[in-house]
Amino acid sequence: MAAATELNRPSSGDRNLERRCRPNLSREVLYEIFRSLHTLVGQLDLRDDVVKITIDWNKLQSLSAFQPALLFSALEQHILYLQPFLAKLQSPIKEENTTAVEEIGRTEMGNKNEVNDKFSIGDLQEEEKHKESDLRDVKKTQIHFDPEVVQIKAGKAEIDRRISAFIERKQAEINENNVREFCNVIDCNQENSCARTDAIFTPYPGFKSHVKVSRVVNTYGPQTRPEGIPGSGHKPNSMLRDCGNQAVEERLQNIEAHLRLQTGGPVPRDIYQRIKKLEDKILELEGISPEYFQSVSFSGKRRKVQPPQQNYSLAELDEKISALKQALLRKSREAESMATHHLP
C-alpha cells in the first residue's frame, strides 16, 4: 500500500526565495529538515505517483518564527521514535552477511575438491617427493661453512663429557664452601644431606654473621711498605705523609689502603670516631662474607713505619739515656723482688 503526500520539489525561483527568507536559525533548521525528507525519497527511488512532496516556501516564510526549544523537542522525539526501527533492520542485515560468508566458504571447498579429483594419488606422491628433495638440497647448502670458525673440534660425546665434568666440579666447589661456612658437625652416616638446609646457626659473640671473624691488633701492616700497591692509585711517597700522630697515621693508612680510598685532605677533629666506624664497617663486611676483600692481595715483606727523623741536642740525648737507664734499673729491681718473693 503506497502512501501519497502532497509535496513538490522546489523550483529555482523558490530556492532564491528560500535564501532570502531565513530570518533566524530555527527557520533554517526547518528548511534543512524538509530538504532531508526530499533526499530520502530520492534515495529510496520512489516515484512521484507514490510519494509526492510539495512545499510552499512563500507561505512558510510568512509564518511566525518557531521557538528553538519547541523545534528541538519535536526533532528529538522524532529521532527517538525512529531508533527502534533501526535496531529491527540490523538483525536481518547480519543474517544476510552470515549467509553470504557461508556460501563463499562452500564454493571455495567445492573448488578444492574438484582440483584434488583431477590429480591422481601418484601425482600427489611425486609432488611430495620433489618437496622432500628440495628440503634436502637446502640442508646441504646450509652445512657448508668455513672450518676455521669452529672453536671446539670435538664430538658430541666429548662435549657432553666436558659439560658434565664442569658441572660436577662447580657443584663440588659450592658444596665445599657450604660445608665450611654453614655446617658445624658433618654426619658421615647420613647419605643425603645439604649443608645449607642442615646447617645449625651458631652466632658468634659480638657478631651477626655465621662466619667467624676475629679482631687483630697489628703493630705494622702490609700498607707500611714504601712501594705503591698495584691498582690502589697510591704513590710510593704517600706513606711518608704524617698527620701529627704516628698511631693515627698508621691506622689511617691501613684503612685507606684496605678500602682503596684516596688519601689526602685535612684531618677532622673527630678522627678517632671516624677510624672506629671504618674499622667496625670492615669487620662487619668480612663477617657477612669473606669474599669482600679477597681481591686485595699484598706481596713483599712487612716493614715498620719509620718514625720521622728528629734532631736532638747533646743535653736532650743525655736526658733520654739517663731516663732509659733508670727504667731498666727499675725493671731489674722489680724482677729481683718478684723472684725473692716466690722463693720458699
From Swiss-Prot:
GO BP of this protein: negative regulation of transcription by RNA polymerase II; positive regulation of gene expression; positive regulation of JNK cascade; regulation of cell cycle; regulation of cell division; regulation of DNA-templated transcription; regulation of embryonic development; regulation of transcription by RNA polymerase II
Record-listed cross-link Glycyl lysine isopeptide (Lys-Gly) (interchain with G-Cter in SUMO2), residues: K94, K118, K129, K139, K153, K235, K301, K304, K325
Extent of the signal sequence: none
Positions bearing Phosphoserine: S91
Residues bearing PTM N6-acetyllysine: K301
GO CC, any one term: cytosol
Positions of region (Leucine-zipper 1): 271-285
Keywords: Acetylation, Cytoplasm, Isopeptide bond, Nucleus, Phosphoprotein, Repeat, Ubl conjugation
Keyword Nucleus belongs to the record: yes
Subunit structure: Component of the ADA2A-containing complex (ATAC), composed of KAT14, KAT2A, TADA2L, TADA3L, ZZ3, MBIP, WDR5, YEATS2, CCDC101 and DR1. In the complex, it probably interacts directly with KAT2A, KAT14 and WDR5.
Major location (coarse): nucleus
A molecular-function term among this protein's GO annotations: identical protein binding
Gene name tied to this protein: MBIP
Tissue: Ubiquitous. High expression seen in the heart and lung.
Designated name of the protein: MAP3K12-binding inhibitory protein 1
Region ranges (Interaction with MAP3K12): 172-344
Native source organism of the sequence: Homo sapiens (Human)
Renumbered residue ranges of the record's region Leucine-zipper 2: 314-329
Localization (cell): Nucleus; Cytoplasm
Function summary: Inhibits the MAP3K12 activity to induce the activation of the JNK/SAPK pathway. Component of the ATAC complex, a complex with histone acetyltransferase activity on histones H3 and H4.
